[in-house]
Amino acid sequence: MVSSATILRMVAPCWRRPSVKGDHSTRDANGRCDGLLWYKDSGNHVAGEFSMSVIQANNLLEDHSKLESGPVSMFDSGPQATFVGVYDGHGGPEAARFVNKHLFDNIRKFTSENHGMSANVITKAFLATEEDFLSLVRRQWQIKPQIASVGACCLVGIICSGLLYIANAGDSRVVLGRLEKAFKIVKAVQLSSEHNASLESVREELRSLHPNDPQIVVLKHKVWRVKGIIQVSRSIGDAYLKKAEFNREPLLAKFRVPEVFHKPILRAEPAITVHKIHPEDQFLIFASDGLWEHLSNQEAVDIVNTCPRNGIARKLIKTALREAAKKREMRYSDLKKIDRGVRRHFHDDITVIVVFLDSHLVSRSTSRRPLLSISGGGDLAGPST
């Protein structure tokens, strides 16, 4: 493995900040970019306040995210909601970018058809987005076969009519900060279930779904992987592990599995929980797994609980980066000098969205707050697909 000191010597002489519009940073209503960091320090949603931030590590940002606040159906008279989506791409940005553009629209469509929000609406929206992306893969297969190996972990939260819907496919995570009045503390409560082969429960699920495949999960270099290839068991995309038609040339050999399969190896169906929001529920921390590699649930909740709301998502990311630097026995100031691509040796792309819950607003079906639509990453995220 290349040492931290060696990488610093490689990049220090030629390092420069990625170009951004304006001088040191850019600011507008949709957030601000400062080098590899994007942030929207504060804003209002229909049920309270929020803070968002993204740090890029990959050469192309693979994390995409969205916060929508307003009608959650195709009609302005429909229920008001706050929608949060965190999409952690792997193999490239295409799947995460696609989901960021289309999943919320599919949720609005099915909410309208259903005349309301439900777990079934969310599942339908995930599966419709999956089918749309697989259709895109099919169209581009001959000219861009690599797109069959691209996928995205998808975490969604919807606050609507006093309920919180959490849907997850992959290993991003949402943690609730809940006030324990008797002990005068704010306790971390994980609301999402994760789909990573490192978890025994996930390995057992895979074995039960594929009883005739002894290689469905393989321990490779001390890491459990599905078919020895990928750690997550659910995603949108990853067509090469969903449809046998993509498990062949011209896809690179490292992505092909030797056995013929007749049903999807990975799944796109999200695990969904519905939580009634109580006055003790203070805030939610949505984040891609890059944050949770460096901070525990309770550490993240303690930071949000004890620090000012303004810029709190950015503070969580900076705290995680300090931990990443410490693990590599280097200074945080030196880590900040490392450019994208090389930066991936030290940490992943990280997305954090902190959503504060105002108990006076949560249960309302209407709100006078302005409509809001913001995508995380700004100029870092590149063009939409």
Curated annotation (Swiss-Prot):
Molecular function terms, GO-annotated: metal ion binding; protein serine/threonine phosphatase activity
Cofactors, names only: Mg(2+); Mn(2+)
UniProt: Mn(2+) 2 binding residues: 88, 289, 348
Domain of life assignment: Eukaryota
Any one Gene Ontology BP term: negative regulation of defense response to bacterium
Pfam families xref list: PP2C
Enzyme Commission number(s) from the entry: 3.1.3.16
Annotated protein name in UniProt: Probable protein phosphatase 2C 38
Native species: Arabidopsis thaliana (Mouse-ear cress)
